Amino acid sequence: MAKAKKTVKPVKSPTTPRSVKAVKDAKGAISPASVLPRIGVRTAEALVEGELGYLCAEPEIVIGDLDGPVGTALATLVGNQVAGHTKVFAILNSDAQVKPATLMVSKVTVTSSRYTNILMGTVQAGIAHGVLDSVRQGIIPKALANSIGIIYSVWLDPEVLKVSPGKVDHEALFAVHREATVKVIKKAMGHEPSIDWLLENQDKVEHYFHECGKQGQF
């Protein structure tokens, strides 16, 4: 006589998905209240310049869900440190990492301790405040602060090293990077510039350094 097959019921996970906000009802049972939006992968570049040559910020970012390719890339970068291009999180100060998690990657190969101190001091602080400004202004929904991440390619002009210690305008440098951070995040979250704008202005916008090259400056 053949034995009846035993039906195995799937075991439900005690945890709720990343994208679901859990709340307790009157009996204490957990139920999904709302599904948070996923943003996929978004990118942007921005430029903000100050009055002095070294007061220039040109971030390029990739922003997306931590449980997707952006999260994988971010974690890989943290674990794959390279001499001269150390990756660090944006922080208000030691022991106070900002949210969304923002990983800074230097575009410049760092060889100077003074450059490091400026990059991981004034510039890092400016970026950290810019990220929080973006949340405060509603550019990044507060509800997504723990579920998305930012990979932030940061530019600090090496010309800053030609300025004597004590003569660098750290307040202005902080402000430039703070403003650039808000600007680049706003562009990424808003898919700016739009494809319509790009097609309309393709022949009206000329790359600055291409123009310099045509003028014989390089």
Model features per residue range: what roles?
Residues 2-218:
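Accessory interaction regions appended to the cores of large information-processing enzymes
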